[in-house]
């Protein structure tokens, strides 16, 4: 695959992920809390959470997602996946990785639902550097 084709492919994948995040915006309560305890992160409010997620997605070059488990009930959704990507170096606050690292992020998202809206999203994460930059 040429460099141009690879860039186009990566851009399409990122656009699809960004469009997905924007489409799911209304599933969040206006006062939703997003937390990643392992990184000491907390984001509050629907617009801030979506902006935060878009910024994180934009920092993942050539993301490859593997979906591991999904379960939902009226009150909770559990979404477990792994994503491998080259870290752009900005956009994932307090990430234990450096710019240019090829990493695998395993994330379990626990979404608490009330009245059909996500009111709390907790992300349990495990970061692994598969190949350090340089």
Question: What spans do the regions from the language model cover?
Answer:
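A beta-strand edge to alpha-helix "cap/lid" segment located at domain peripheries
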Residues: 2-3, 51-134
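Short acidic-aromatic low-complexity motifs
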Residues: 1-30
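Secondary-structure boundary/capping motif
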Residues: 11, 28-29, 42, 106-111, ...
């Amino acid at each position: 695959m040429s460099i141009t084709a690879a860039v186009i492919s990566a851009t399409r994948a990122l656009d699809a992920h960004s469009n997905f995040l924007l489409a799911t915006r209304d599933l969040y309560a206006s006062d939703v809390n997003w937390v990643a305890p392992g990184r000491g992160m907390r984001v509050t409010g629907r617009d801030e959470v979506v902006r935060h997620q878009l910024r994180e997605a934009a920092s993942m070059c050539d993301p490859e997602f593997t979906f591991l488990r999904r379960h939902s009930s009226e009150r909770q959704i559990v979404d477990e996946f792994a994503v491998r990507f080259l870290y752009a170096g900005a956009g994932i606050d307090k990430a234990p990785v450096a710019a240019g690292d090829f990493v695998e992020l395993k994330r379990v998202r626990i979404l608490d639902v009330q009245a059909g809206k996500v009111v709390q999203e907790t992300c349990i994460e495990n970061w692994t550097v598969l190949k350090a930059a340089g």
